[in-house]
């Protein structure tokens, strides 16, 4: 049995606090572009390693950097002047010794990484010309010998932690968190893009709740080739605002909602107009891990890990596995009848099996009429079950079925 501790969460339930702030950086934000590219490269390497070697080999591709380009957007359609530059860096296993033949097997790491990055950009940024608007440069190197040894040790058994680190998670999402998350998903959905193609992918949603009032301040790039006049631009904002307000009704739960889009505009001389749908074309830079946490949100009123989740190897990198696992456990514990809120923290020790954390801390707020002592055994059972089946988390990640940002 793992060292699992359950205790009462000594705080006011989040929805009853006077103030809450929640943020999400959309998929076209420069930081999120880096997160998405890094994770796509990792997933592609996992699949390549399994195809070539039968197992996922050591890699960490969480060092993607984006250097903003330069564009000249204008009503009716502008142009890129200098391309966006994306650097893929990190470490990966590029050569493997075949013990039977004694030969060195070289693995197509750089080709796999560049192709994965470009495929992701094509999917995420529909108005970007991959041949002209972006340069993808791969400088991924060979992994550290010591860390590779930890990664490979007893491969047929449970992986060992690559570091002494921790992961955190919480559930359920608050009303504000749900609205912020679902608003960005709506604005970047295929359905909305088909209806309002001028809406770009660079969207940031900042949610503020004061009592029972929620204010969404949304930065939303517009794509210039779909906007022929300032009146068109204003209409795009109005249509998007109406869609956001309608969608939010499903989650408001009695809250008042105010939606503000592109508040820096004067709708004549200063508007958020882009060629590609992202501010990365206008000198805005990006890095992995500088935006959304593993649950897709930035939540300063909740515990958060500063670890970047995207791009880390899904076998034994605690910064990835324990952050994702913490959220999964929190979601399952929150489904127990009588649990109002749940927070999870999991701490590893380097070199120890990832199924044996130094501690797995569960904090809960019981609903009225329920006692912590009655809820504790069920919560521990859920946590232990996930530790015993931790490789399922890895399988979900490798298959691309887990969101890391």
From Swiss-Prot:
Q: In which pathway does it act?
A: Amino-acid biosynthesis; S-adenosyl-L-methionine biosynthesis; S-adenosyl-L-methionine from L-methionine: step 1/1
Q: Which Pfam families match?
A: AdoMet_Synthase (PF01941)
Keyword match Transit peptide: no
Cofactor dependence is on: Mg(2+)
Q: Which superkingdom does the taxonomy of this entry point to?
A: Archaea
Q: Which InterPro entries match?
A: AdoMet_synthase_2_family, AdoMet_synthase_3, S-AdoMet_synthetase_arc
Keyword Isomerase present in the record's keywords: the answer is no
Question: Which one GO biological process term can you cite for this protein?
Answer: S-adenosylmethionine biosynthetic process
Question: What GO molecular function terms would the record report?
Answer: ATP binding; magnesium ion binding; methionine adenosyltransferase activity
Q: What class of enzyme is it?
A: transferase
EC numbers: 2.5.1.6
What are the protein's UniProt keywords? Answer: ATP-binding, Magnesium, Nucleotide-binding, One-carbon metabolism, Transferase
Q: Name the reaction it catalyses.
A: L-methionine + ATP + H2O = S-adenosyl-L-methionine + phosphate + diphosphate
Q: Where does ATP bind?
A: 141-146
Instruction: Tell me its family.
Output: Belongs to the AdoMet synthase 2 family.
Q: Function, please?
A: Catalyzes the formation of S-adenosylmethionine from methionine and ATP.
What protein does this entry describe?
Answer: S-adenosylmethionine synthase
Specify the species. Answer: Methanococcus maripaludis (strain C7 / ATCC BAA-1331)
